[in-house]
Regions:
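Exposed, interaction-prone extracellular/peripheral surfaces
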Residues: 1-23, 27, 190-192, 223-462
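Extracellular/lumenal glycan-associated context and N-glycosylation machinery
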Residues: 1-79
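An amphipathic, basic-hydrophobic helix/alpha-beta surface used to engage anionic
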Residues: 50-52, 60-312, 356-360, 374
Length: 462
């Protein structure tokens, strides 16, 4: 069943067959059966024909109910619908269950129980009265989780009973849905980017298809092309009309790097440093996508999402919309990595200029701080949010730990990063604005140095 949309739920397998159906006799059904057998035995001993007929009636009634219930199953169909199927942590989603009696017989009492993980709340149970032939019933319940992840809903269990209360059978539908709980996000203030981009609100650049008259890559003439764009040298060479290519719009790029190393974070739970970093990465992704950037998510183990298109970036606005869901789904289930370094992420970044780099780091030792510093060389602009996990556990850093964190920030800033220390409970929106203020100093320091080898964004924030 597709998550978020209605779909039929089919019956599961019947374990035990008729024997299991007989095991579903209620106390009333067993009493009728026992009374009928006892009456039949007494009638045989006493030679009372009327008593024998009464005994057979009492014994036959529960057996007929079992047979009818087992054979027909009342042909109950069900659908489940999630609204919505993807929610931020701490937000409720509603699950709608719809049951329909598609047989010609009315049902007895129906008891529904949907299996949900305990992290989403108690298992919902519903009791439906008699459902007429062709009738429908709809119930709903709410689920909520403070922890991100993917949670299965189902299968739905349905307990059937006959109109006389003689027998109860349980059926399990095989279909299930998946609720995706994504990280919490917060809106970020518009901070204008410096560099060669045409504007932060557009996130686009103009890339010429030619560097000079001799470097032209022409294309064939198409009806409606301006004759002033005809390239006569190429026309003479190829024997057909060739025109110069127009300037091609190129979306500015942004890489969001998330440090997931287990050794870089301390503590667990929704208020831990790691969860703050995941939430921050999700907020940055959505913010940059809204500004028109081609965005990708990169982790310390070198994994890149969406991973399609040139360099792993989405190639169009439509693809970005799909990629946003893919990246948020990835962040919903991202966990700590067992790696100890950032070298794999650096290998991905050093392949070429990747535009803007926004990183969320955990604890950095001297070696990993040096690797992070080298990442700046292949990025047009770089902003780092560094979490001191020791402070997140103890409430604040003391002495040597605080001095070490400040030393790592100094190393990043000297290499051209705009680096911000993240303290426990800090709001990303405020740190985002603070990064814009600090970048003025960073960009001024970089303006006197060489920037060869980088294109696109030539500075950090302004």
């Amino acid at each position: 069943m597709a998550a978020g949309g209605p779909a039929a739920m089919n019956d599961g397998d019947d374990k035990g067959g008729p024997r299991a159906a007989l095991g579903g006799l209620t106390t009333r059904g067993r009493s009728f059966l026992a009374a009928g057998i006892a009456a039949a035995v007494c009638a045989y001993v006493l030679g009372q024909g009327d008593l024998l007929r009464v005994g057979l009636l009492l014994a036959t009634l529960p057996l007929v109910c079992v047979a009818v219930l087992f054979r027909t199953r009342y042909r109950v169909a069900g659908t489940r619908r999630l609204s919505p199927s993807r929610v931020p942590a701490g937000t409720e989603a509603r699950v709608h269950l719809r049951m329909e009696n598609v047989s010609r017989l009315p049902t007895g009492l129906l008891m529904l129980q949907d299996r949900v993980p305990y992290v989403l709340g108690p298992r919902p149970r519903f009791v439906l009265d008699r459902v007429e032939a062709g009738g429908r019933r709809e119930v709903s319940y709410r689920v909520r989780s403070d922890l991100r992840g993917r949670y299965p809903l189902g299968p739905l269990q349905l307990q059937l009973s006959d109109p006389f209360g003689m027998c109860e059978l349980t059926r399990s539908f095989s279909a299930y849905d998946t609720l995706v709980v994504i990280p919490r996000t917060e809106p970020l203030p518009p901070v204008r980017l410096a560099g060669e981009a045409s504007g932060y609100g557009e996130g686009r650049q103009r890339a010429l298809a030619l560097a000079g008259e001799d470097d032209l890559i022409p294309r064939g003439y198409r009806h409606g092309d301006d004759l002033r764009r005809v390239h006569w040298r190429s026309t003479a060479r190829y024997g057909e009309l060739m025109v110069r290519r127009e300037e091609q719009p190129q979306r500015a790029r942004c890489t969001v790097l998330l440090d997931t190393r287990r050794i870089a974070y301390q503590g667990t739970g929704p208020d831990s440093a790691f969860e703050w970093a995941v939430s921050g990465a999700a907020s940055a992704l959505l913010h940059m996508l809204e500004r028109g950037f081609a965005v990708r998510l990169l982790t310390d183990d070198g994994s890149s999402v969406p991973g399609e298109g040139e360099g792993g970036f989405a190639g169009s606005t439509h693809e970005s919309a799909d990629s946003a869901g893919l990246m948020m789904d990835t962040l919903a289930v991202v966990d700590h990595s067992d790696g100890g370094g950032l070298s794999r992420a650096y290998d991905v970044l050093r392949g070429g200029n990747q535009g803007l780099l926004v990183a969320f780091f955990g604890d950095l030792d001297e070696e990993q701080a040096a690797v992070a510093a080298r990442m700046r060389q292949r990025s047009g602009g770089a902003v780092a949010f560094v979490l001191d996990s020791d402070a997140w556990v103890q409430g604040e850093s003391h002495g040597a730990a605080l001095a070490e964190a400040e030393e790592r920030l100094r190393l990043l800033r000297e290499s051209g990063w705009t680096a911000v220390l993240v303290k426990p409970g800090a709001a990303l929106a405020e740190l985002w604005q603070l990064a814009g203020q600090q970048s003025t100093v960073t960009q001024s320091a970089l303006s006197g140095g060489a920037t060869g080898g980088t294109t696109g964004f030539t500075g950090g924030w302004s």
